[in-house]
Amino acid sequence: MGKFNLGALRVRQNALAQKSSGKISQTPCWVDIVSEIPPATVLVRNLPQQHALVQQRVKTLPGKSRPQTVIEEREIRRIKTKKASRMFQPMQIRYEEDELRKQFFQDHPWELARPRVVLETNGNDHARYDWSRLQQRGKRLDGESVVQRQLYLLNNVPDITKGEAYDIARREFYQLRLQEDIERRVAQEEARATGAYFGPDMMQVGMELENQEYDRWKIWAEKEAEQASQRLAAFAGATGGAKEESDPAILPELEVAESTSESAQPAEIRTG
């Protein structure tokens, strides 16, 4: 059958053959079950299931006076240029929070640099949060708070758009961040007034270490450049010195030529 292995389909047949030949003393207990419910014989692989993006909105439908909760399903666009080797891989499950989270952290990349606590007590901490307000008890304010607040507005406020919900959540986030900065500054001033001393923070320490490393590298680079120039100069000087030492008779001949030229020049002038 080529690359197809049908050994699993013949497991009952092999077990009965081994029992009849005496290789095994007892018939396996699963023989009757396999005869009633045989393994699947379909060799065609089906494509993985497409997961739709489910959204909950509160909208005022035509002909209705009160807004109603509507569940919308949006199909995810398939990627046409998909490799054949990835055709049967499971499809990615997407949630509405993924798009909101991507938009927020794209607009606020420095929020990813803030330390976060990802430890949970029982895995159900989200159940006690009430996202009708942005600030939660027992949870530090971060970008995830903005995402959950925006999702709450989209799911509960009638006829609100994604941009409006994002602006509301972002405005509340900026106000709380400003309040935290003011509280931190006031606490630092009060502590200094009572004699507290604050050393450099982690960012300043890191910058100082980086400057020291740069200075060490600069000294090393200057030494390397100086040694390289000395090697080139020594090589050129050794070549010229070797030529001069190989011909010691050149210097006396040059001295004799210079003396004769000096003595001959005034004589020519007098005769003229």
From Swiss-Prot:
Region labeled Disordered — which residues?
236-272
The protein's location, in the record's own words, is: Mitochondrion
Query: Which keywords does UniProt give here?
Result: Mitochondrion, Ribonucleoprotein, Ribosomal protein
Q: Which residue positions does the secretion signal occupy?
A: none
Q: Can you list the GO cellular component terms from the UniProt entry?
A: mitochondrial small ribosomal subunit
Q: Which Pfam families match?
A: MRP-S25
Q: What is its main location?
A: mitochondrion
Q: Which InterPro entries match?
A: Ribosomal_mS23_fun
Taxonomic superkingdom: Eukaryota
- Similarity-based family: Belongs to the mitochondrion-specific ribosomal protein mS23 family.
Q: Which PANTHER family match?
A: 37S RIBOSOMAL PROTEIN S25, MITOCHONDRIAL, SMALL RIBOSOMAL SUBUNIT PROTEIN MS23
Name this protein carries in UniProt: Small ribosomal subunit protein mS23
